[in-house]
């Protein structure tokens, strides 16, 4: 999709949402995590399926990426999408756009060994368009506000 196509689509959608704000809120398709074996899960939704697992030191088999990896992947792609969208709105053609999300895990927290342990937030110097992309990323906003979603849990 060209920059101009993106710009026109966003412009048209923005006009619609300005005139009819109720149309801006949509329900996302459900995602269901089903236990496969051990700590491996199959996540399925209307558009596909992925697998997760944990590393052996945590009791998994490392047969797939961890849930945290998918969170970082979603955050990186959502921020990149918002940056590209903003650039298109401003008529800027990007020759290169890469977003890298770094994190550090202290496994004492997830294991319940030290509840004060929280992941460190990496420091980065961001340009205005990157800041805008991060602030407007639906994934980043959801994570920051803690309004994750409605969860339905079935045990058996």
Model-derived regions: residue spans:
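Extended beta-strand/beta-hairpin segments
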Residues: 1-73, 83-156
């Amino acid at each position: 999709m060209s920059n101009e196509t993106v710009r026109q689509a966003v412009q048209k959608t923005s006009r619609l949402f300005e005139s009819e704000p109720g149309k801006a809120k949509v329900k996302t398709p459900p995602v269901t995590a089903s236990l496969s074996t051990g700590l491996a899960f199959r996540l399925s939704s209307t558009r596909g399926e992925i697998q997760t697992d944990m590393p052996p030191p945590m009791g998994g088999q490392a047969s797939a990426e961890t849930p945290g990896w998918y969170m970082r992947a979603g955050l990186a792609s959502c921020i990149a999408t918002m940056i590209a969208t903003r650039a298109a709105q401003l008529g800027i053609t990007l020759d290169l756009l890469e977003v890298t999300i770094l994190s550090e895990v202290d496994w004492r927290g997830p294991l319940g060994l030290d509840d004060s342990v929280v992941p460190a937030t990496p420091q980065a110097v961001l340009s205005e368009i990157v800041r805008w992309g991060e602030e407007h990323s639906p994934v980043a906003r959801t994570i920051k506000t803690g309004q994750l979603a409605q969860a339905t849990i079935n045990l058996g």
